[in-house]
Regions:
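Core SAM-dependent methyltransferase catalytic element
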Residues: 211-232
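A short SAM/SAH-binding and catalytic strip from SAM-dependent methyltransferases
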Residues: 119-133
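Class I SAM-dependent methyltransferase "Motif I" SAM/SAH-binding loop
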Residues: 59-63
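A short glycine-rich, Lys/Arg-flanked "PGG" loop and its adjoining helix->strand segment in the class I
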Residues: 134-146
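Class I SAM-dependent methyltransferase SAM/SAH-binding core
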Residues: 54-56, 66-111
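A short acidic, Gly/Pro-enriched loop at the edge of an enzyme's catalytic core
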Residues: 108-121
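C-terminal alpha-helical "lid/dimerization" subdomain adjacent to the S-adenosyl-L-methionine
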Residues: 153-210, 217
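Conserved Class I S-adenosyl-L-methionine-dependent methyltransferase catalytic core
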Residues: 1-53
Length: 232
């Protein structure tokens, strides 16, 4: 029915194993790269986090990225958001077990994040799942402090379909994920762009520029991910 109608399939309609399975899939990359490579590559960000910054983690799922940042930067306050209530419930349980008092979780759509003048807003492997990624980026821009940064982490992809298939070993896997999960999730939302997890850096940076950020750059890349920095 999803393929016949093009209406998509909402994220919340998947079996619950999809949610914990997605977290388990991405966890090794976050544990291995987020604190040691990705954040240090973001110009001006790590010093703020060490001193004490306000951070929004949007589309946080079960909260792995949120908890890693909360543990590493105890002087900072992390607000984590996801529109999927059951995932937020599980994230709260996991954070409570770790005793993280600088981390709060909220059920919220990505385009409805409160304006808290965040120093850093992040989306990890979820921007492409959103029906209106440009609209979300514009909304996030409005929640940032004047010198705030938007960090977008997306699955590794190369520009150009042929180039990506031939030279990116993970492309076939992510095209499969995108067909079954990511694109249908996006199509089930307003606008329904259907960006997919293999858009490539040129397309993604173009969307961030379209959202009105003053500067956009590819800050880091690892075998698993692309990391973009967009400054307000």
């Amino acid at each position: 029915d999803v393929f016949q109608t093009g209406r998509g399939r909402p994220w919340g309609e998947h079996h619950e194993c999809c949610f914990c399975g997605t977290e388990r899939f991405f966890r090794p990359a976050y544990a291995g790269h987020l604190l040691d490579e990705w954040i240090p590559a973001m110009e001006g960000v790590e010093d703020k986090l060490k001193k004490g910054a306000k951070v929004a983690d949007i589309g946080c799922g079960l909260g792995t990225s949120s908890m890693l940042m909360a543990e590493q930067y105890p002087n900072s306050t992390i607000h984590a958001f996801d529109f999927h209530g059951p995932s937020i419930d599980e994230a709260k349980k996991r954070a409570a077990e770790k005793g993280l008092d600088n981390l709060e979780f909220f059920v919220s759509d990505a385009s409805a994040i409160p304006n808290e003048s965040y120093d850093l807003a992040c989306i990890f492997d979820a921007w492409h799942d959103m029906g209106d990624p440009v609209g979300v980026a514009k909304s996030i821009k409005d929640t940032l402090a004047d010198d705030g940064t938007f960090m977008v982490v997306e699955p590794m992809a190369l520009d150009g379909l042929k180039n990506n298939i031939e030279n990116n070993p993970s492309s076939s896997m992510f095209y499969g994920f995108g067909t079954l999960i990511c694109v249908p999730a996006s199509k089930a939302q307003p606008i329904g762009l259907g960006l997919g997890p293999q858009a490539g850096p040129k397309k993604l940076m173009g969307l961030l520029s379209e959202a009105g950020f003053s500067s956009v750059s590819l800050a880091a890349e690892t075998t698993s991910n692309l990391v973009f920095q967009a400054n307000k």
